[in-house]
C-alpha cells in the first residue's frame, strides 16, 4: 500500500486482511520500491493514483518483467488518461480498474472493473468508457448531476456530481458554514464537475474549484494535463490559471521533467495546441523540481496558483 491508510486505502487494506492476505506497507511513494515489490513479492493488488501509474510506465525497468500475479491495479484520486490505461494493460495485463470516491462519502461512489476496462479497450464502440470512472456502487443510495440552481440534469449534461445515502457524512466538525455549503438542495455536493451517460457511467471533467475561465471560455485543467502526460519529457504536471490582464486567467502548465529529458517550452506548447487547439493550450509552461503535494499525494493547485501569481521565478 502506497497511499496513506487514513482514508480509502485503509478500507482496501482491511479487505486484504479479511481475505487472509498480506499488506506491504510503504513509507513513501518510492518508485524503485514499488517495482521491487511487484517483481519479487507476488503482488496481487496495487492501489496507486494516476500520476504514479504514469511514472511507473516511464520507468526503464518496468517492462523487464511479467506480472502474472497481479489481478487488480486500482487507480483513484483523479481520472486517468485513456491512452495510459491501454499502455498499462500492455505492461501489466487486463488488471486496470478505477473508483471515484471521497472521504465525505464514506464508501467508493463508483467502480469500473478490470473486465469492463479490458472490454472497452478491445471494442471501438465502447472505447469512450476508458475515460469514465464507472457506475454507482451499491453502497451509495443515489448519485446525480446538478446545476447551480439545484436542478438535476439529464444524461449527457455536465454539472456538479451530487450524492445521497446513509454513508454520507453528517457534516464537518465545528464548521456549520462549510457543512451547509456542501449540503445544499438536500444533496451532498462533491465539488467535482462531470456527467452521466445513458447507461449510468460517470465521466469526471475536473474539480469545480480548479476550472479556469480564460477569454470567456471554461477550461478544465485535467484535459490539458492528460495531454501533457503523453509527452516524453513530462514526468509529472499540473495546470492552473493565473491572473492575466488580457485573458482574465492564463492557462499555465507546471511540469517535472522526466529523467534525462530536455525541455523546449514552445515545442511543448505547440504539442498541446495540436491536440487541444489554441484556446486550451497553455500560454506558458514552467519547470519545477517538485510539485507541492498534500499528505495523501495530491498536487496542491491552490499553492501553485499563489506562487505563480507572485512570479514564476519563485517556482
What are these model-derived regions, one by one?
Residues 18-21, 43-48, 57-128, 141-142, ...:
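Gly/Ser/Thr-rich phosphate-binding loop
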Residues 38, 46, 165, 170-171, ...:
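AMP-binding/adenylate-forming catalytic core of the ANL superfamily
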Residues 61, 69, 93, 139, ...:
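Glycine-centered tight turns that cap/initiate beta-strands
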Residues 77, 101, 134, 192, ...:
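Active-site glycine-centered loops adjacent to acidic/histidine catalytic or metal-binding residues
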Residues 97-104, 108, 134-135, 240-243, ...:
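Beta-strand->loop->alpha-helix junctions that form or flank phosphate-binding loops
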Residues 306-315:
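Acidic/polar alpha-helix N-cap and adjacent early helical turns
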Amino acid at each position: 500500500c502506497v497511499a496513506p491508510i487514513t482514508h480509502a486505502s485503509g478500507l482496501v487494506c482491511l479487505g486484504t486482511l479479511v481475505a487472509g492476505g498480506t499488506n506491504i506497507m510503504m513509507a513513501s511513494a518510492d518508485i524503485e520500491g514499488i517495482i521491487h515489490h511487484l517483481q519479487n513479492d507476488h503482488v496481487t493488488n496495487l492501489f496507486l493514483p494516476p500520476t504514479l501509474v504514469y511514472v511507473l510506465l516511464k520507468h526503464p525497468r518496468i517492462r523487464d518483467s511479467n506480472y502474472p500475479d497481479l489481478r487488480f491495479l486500482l487507480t483513484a484520486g483523479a481520472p486517468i488518461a485513456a491512452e495510459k490505461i491501454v499502455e498499462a494493460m500492455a505492461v501489466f495485463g487486463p488488471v486496470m480498474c478505477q473508483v471515484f470516491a471521497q472521504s465525505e462519502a464514506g464508501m467508493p461512489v463508483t467502480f469500473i472493473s478490470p473486465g469492463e476496462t479490458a472490454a472497452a479497450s478491445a471494442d471501438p464502440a465502447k472505447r469512450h468508457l476508458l475515460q469514465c470512472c464507472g457506475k454507482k456502487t451499491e453502497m451509495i443510495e443515489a448519485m446525480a448531476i446538478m446545476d447551480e440552481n439545484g436542478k438535476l440534469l439529464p444524461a449527457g449534461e455536465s454539472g456538479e456530481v451530487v450524492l445521497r445515502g446513509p454513508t454520507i457524512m453528517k457534516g464537518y466538525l465545528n464548521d456549520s458554514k462549510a457543512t451547509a455549503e456542501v449540503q445544499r438542495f438536500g444533496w451532498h455536493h462533491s465539488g467535482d464537475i462531470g456527467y452521466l451517460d445513458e447507461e449510468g457511467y460517470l465521466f469526471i471533467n475536473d474539480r469545480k474549484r480548479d476550472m479556469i475561465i480564460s477569454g470567456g471560455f471554461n477550461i478544465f485543467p485535467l484535459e490539458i494535463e492528460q495531454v501533457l502526460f503523453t509527452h516524453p519529457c513530462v514526468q509529472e504536471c499540473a495546470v492552473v490559471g493565473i491572473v492575466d490582464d488580457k485573458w482574465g486567467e492564463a492557462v499555465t502548465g507546471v511540469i517535472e521533467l522526466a529523467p534525462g529529458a530536455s525541455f523546449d517550452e514552445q515545442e511543448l506548447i505547440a504539442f498541446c495546441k495540436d491536440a487541444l487547439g489554441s484556446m486550451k493550450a497553455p500560454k506558458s509552461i514552467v519547470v519545477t523540481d517538485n510539485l507541492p503535494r498534500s499528505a495523501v499525494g495530491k498536487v496542491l493547485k491552490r499553492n501553485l496558483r499563489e506562487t505563480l501569481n507572485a512570479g514564476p521565478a519563485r517556482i
